[in-house]
């Protein structure tokens, strides 16, 4: 099974896989889901998936939740799909592990 993130220590970047549920009651990251033998973090977002509103809210939410700059968060795959790959730039591996471990239950 593929894990939901990959970290590149030379560039201090991480790729994370998310399963996004737009139009939710609250913004929330909750545990994992496995699809086609790939792990995804489950992410609920209040915004509707129209005109990039949900994608924008994803970036805003992750930046606030993880105390990162919005400019260091980029959706690189899945702009119009619920399965998204998100690039996190300028992140320390220890800090990334701290974030990830907070969602492992």
Curated annotation (Swiss-Prot):
Pfam family, one: DUF167
Domain of life according to the entry: Bacteria
SMART domains in the record: DUF167
GO CC, any one term: cytoplasm
Matches recorded under InterPro entries: DUF167 (IPR003746), YggU-like_sf (IPR036591)
Stretches that traverse the bilayer: none
PANTHER family in UniProt: UPF0235 PROTEIN C15ORF40
Family listed: Belongs to the UPF0235 family.
Protein name: UPF0235 protein A1G_07140
Native organism: Rickettsia rickettsii (strain Sheila Smith)
């Amino acid at each position: 099974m593929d894990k939901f993130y990959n970290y590149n220590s030379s560039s201090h970047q991480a790729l994370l896989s998310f399963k996004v549920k737009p139009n939710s009651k609250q913004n929330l990251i909750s545990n994992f889901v496995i699809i086609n033998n790939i792990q995804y973090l489950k992410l609920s977002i209040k915004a509707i998936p129209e005109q990039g509103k949900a994608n924008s809210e994803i970036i805003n939410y992750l930046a606030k939740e993880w105390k990162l700059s919005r400019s260091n968060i980029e959706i690189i795959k899945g702009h119009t799909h619920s399965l998204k790959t998100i690039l996190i730039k300028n992140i320390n591996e220890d800090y990334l592990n701290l974030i990830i471990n907070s969602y492992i239950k």
